[in-house]
Amino acid sequence: MRIAVVAPSCPLKRDAATRVEELAAAAGVTLVVHPQCFLEDGHFAGPDADRLAALREVMADPGIDAVWFARGGYGSNRIAVAAANDLPAAARAKTYLGYSDGGFLLAALHKAGLRVAHGPMVQDVAREGGEAAVRRALAWLASGDREALEPGLDGPAMAFNLVVLSSLMGTPLEPDFNGAELLIEEVDEELYRIDRFLFHVSSQPGFAAVRQLRLGRCLVRDNDRPFGIELEAVARHWCERAGVRYAGRADIGHDSLNRIVPFPSRNA
């Protein structure tokens, strides 16, 4: 099993790469960390052209079985459309794993018919308990370990960071939910912002195709005055307004407990 690591958003820390290479070797997996992961160009892991070229290179490599996004941050939206165009044949034989800002690429590649999943990334090894998250991702990529999956999955599902999903809605990369369950998570946002993002997401016509919504972990930042509505009440409110069932909590989030959510198969 050969897994390529690229950084479509922000740079990967070298110590994180080294630790994950060791964990991968112990699991019998060859980790191929692209040099682009360590480039720095302002906020990004290299210019757009370099990040796109690295991703397209590993997508086209028939010797690579899976593509693992190094980390989140910001920037994958700038290359997502181009990444999913004119796909090489080898790209369709791979699985693509990531979350957070990587959700832009998950959406684009899924719409193009590729196998994608929400799940832990390489830089997560630096979190408290992060080695467990990395082992979970490696076990799923290498052998499809079902223990790594979000335990409440009972049918087709998709998972996104809420800010990323809100940015996707109304664009050519908006997910086609087509009866899938939607899992969302968020980090470091005030409740009023979460309320606003859910307003935008649930107001889009495509949201009506969601079978049900579950809420992952959301690290809420304090506002200058109390919002006055609890997190789950916010989610229930916008689900009720849109006629979509709210189905409770989900085991995903920006943390080491983050579980894997494979997106449903799709023909481009």
Where are these regions (language model features)?
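A short, flexible N-terminal coil/short beta segment enriched in small residues
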Residues: M1-A27, G129-F160
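ATP/nucleoside-binding phosphotransfer catalytic cores, i.e., glycine-rich phosphate-binding loops
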Residues: Q212-A268
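ATP/pyrophosphate-binding catalytic subdomain of soluble kinases
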Residues: A133-S202
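ATP/NTP phosphate-donor binding region
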Residues: M1-G63
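Short internal beta-strands
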Residues: V33-P35, G98, V210-R217
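Charged helix-capping and loop-helix junction motifs
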Residues: P47-A53, R196-V201, F227-V234
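Active-site histidine-anchored catalytic micro-motif
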Residues: F44-G155
